[in-house]
Amino acid sequence: MLSKFTAILLAVHIALFACALTQAEKRHKLTRPAFHPNAPYLAGKRIVGGFVIDISDAPYQISLQYNGKHHCGGSILNSKWILTAAHCIDLYSEVKPTVRVGSSEHAAGGTVLHLLRIVPHPGHSSGGNNYDIALLELECELTFNDNVQPVQLPEQDDPIDEGTMGIVSGWGMTMSAADLNAILRATNVPTVNQQECNQAYQSYGGVAEQMFCAGYKQGGTGTCRNDSGGPFVAEGKLIGVVSWSHECALAGYPGVYARVASVRDWIRETSGV
């Protein structure tokens, strides 16, 4: 019979094994499920016209994965909680996602963790754009290092000044029909006038107060497919979550982001962060 000490050690090893999948296990998972957001302009998107960065430059960045394949981005809030876009977890009833942290590559390196709980914002409806925010609780706590760090959050209803420059990052497409980027990329874009953005998107229902827009009038750089859920960080704070747009970095159509400050109290009440 196993000694009590041996049994305890075995239980600990099993628990750790369940929390973080090894790279060998991930290679034997099923292929990526076919998934398309209900709204054609939702940005499962990618960084267009950006530049390669190391994960240590954005250590809060995570890859949300289905069947071992990158699907969306997200941000580390603390050792147990991740913030992403609500439309990124619409598949949860069919396929349980995992999270990769601490790697510049979405398909290798770092650590892959299981989720304990997924909490979409109560104001979000499947296929809709408003309150496109969800919290993910990890089964195991993260160990922080140079490649894994939480990002700071704004306070409830903190304003965003027009022209605020932010950095957005992800593994999304660099062209509308290209393959996923293997290496993390980023770009810098300014926030734009809310009324002008709302006018640009009138045929798509407009832009709500819980959203903001960022990009250049001439287009050319921004988010694209599979960047959704990723971070928009300005002055060290996560002020936006990549949500949707019309096409990718198209002139006249800036990217639309979920406004983190509009749900700050809900994040605190739900996660304690």
From Swiss-Prot:
Pro-sequence residue ranges: 23-46
Disulphide bond pairs: 72-88, 197-213, 224-248
Top EC class of this enzyme: hydrolase
Peptidase S1 domain sequence ranges: 47-272
GO MF term list: serine-type endopeptidase activity
InterPro entries: Peptidase_S1, Peptidase_S1_PA, Peptidase_S1_PA_chymotrypsin, Peptidase_S1A, Trypsin_dom, TRYPSIN_HIS
Domain of life: Eukaryota
Tissue expression as described in the entry: Expressed in the midgut. Expression levels drop a few hours after blood feeding and pick up again 28 hours later.
GO annotation (BP), single: digestion
Main location: secreted
One GO CC annotation: extracellular region
PROSITE patterns: TRYPSIN_DOM (PS50240), TRYPSIN_HIS (PS00134)
Keyword entries, A-Z: Cleavage on pair of basic residues, Digestion, Disulfide bond, Hydrolase, Protease, Secreted, Serine protease, Signal, Zymogen
Marked site: Required for specificity: 222
Enzyme Commission code(s) on record: 3.4.21.4
Gene3D superfamilies: Trypsin-like serine proteases
Alphabetical list of Pfam families matching this protein: Trypsin
Subcellular location: Secreted
SMART domains according to UniProt: Tryp_SPc
Function as written in the Swiss-Prot or TrEMBL entry: Constitutive trypsin that is expressed 2 days after emergence, coinciding with host seeking behavior of the female.
Record family assignment: Belongs to the peptidase S1 family.
Name used for this protein in its record: Trypsin-6
